[in-house]
Amino acid sequence: MDKFTTLEGVAAPLKIINVDTDMIIPKQYLKTIKRTGLGKGLFSEQRYKDDGSENPDFILNKPAYRGAKILVAGDNFGCGSSREHAPWALLDFGIRCVISTSFGDIFYNNCFKNGVLPIRVSQADLDKLFDDAERGSNATMTIDLQAQEIRGPDGGAIKFEIDPFRKHCLINGLDDIGLTLEKKPSIDAYETKLKTERAWA
């Protein structure tokens, strides 16, 4: 998992509440267990028309937001069924941070395990971030995980809270496997000791 320290990029405003995981990545894209290639399916029912052509009105199809790295979204983002493909799709598209007032619990947890930072803010702060994001390509924001700050295009900062353990994992690029490997010296020492104490086993 790539480390997350500071992220700077365009923020796309998605002013929709209750965006569920089926909207983020529809079920037809769940047949694969590969984490790559899912960006094309991100919000596919909103991004594409029935004939397969792009919907020019959808935010991520607008020229200013095609390269968005941050998504500013409405309340209760990522609700609905459990599917780890949702953060995979965001990440494959290029989005590493989602900001909202609240998230679906399972989606929230899956984000941290896959290198995507979900940030909870107040409604007042979200409204300010929506205003900033609507500036288009001039809406560059900086997410400073170490300082726990969102810095807008005008230099103003919004503080956010994050669990210290999850912060540690993101900054150091540690997923579940990485966390286990951190303990490898202790695991090896235990196994060596066990072989000595239970040579008969």
UniProtKB/Swiss-Prot annotation:
Catalytic activity: (2R,3S)-3-isopropylmalate = (2S)-2-isopropylmalate
Coiled coil: none
Stored SUPFAM superfamilies: LeuD/IlvD-like (SSF52016)
Keyword Ion transport attached: no
Pfam families noted in UniProt: Aconitase_C
Annotated GO MF terms: 3-isopropylmalate dehydratase activity
Keywords: Amino-acid biosynthesis, Branched-chain amino acid biosynthesis, Leucine biosynthesis, Lyase
GO CC annotations, alphabetized: 3-isopropylmalate dehydratase complex
Top-rank taxon, per record: Bacteria
EC number: 4.2.1.33
Cited InterPro entries: 3-IsopropMal_deHydase_ssu, Aconitase/3IPM_dehydase_swvl, AconitaseA/IPMdHydase_ssu_swvl, IPMI_Swivel, LeuD
Biological process terms in GO annotation: L-leucine biosynthetic process
Pathway as given in its UniProt record: Amino-acid biosynthesis; L-leucine biosynthesis; L-leucine from 3-methyl-2-oxobutanoate: step 2/4
Quaternary structure annotation from Swiss-Prot or TrEMBL: Heterodimer of LeuC and LeuD.
NCBIfam families per the UniProt record, alphabetical: leuD, PRK01641.1
Family: Belongs to the LeuD family. LeuD type 1 subfamily.
Function: Catalyzes the isomerization between 2-isopropylmalate and 3-isopropylmalate, via the formation of 2-isopropylmaleate.
Protein name (record): 3-isopropylmalate dehydratase small subunit
Lineage: Bacteria, Pseudomonadati, Pseudomonadota, Alphaproteobacteria, Hyphomicrobiales
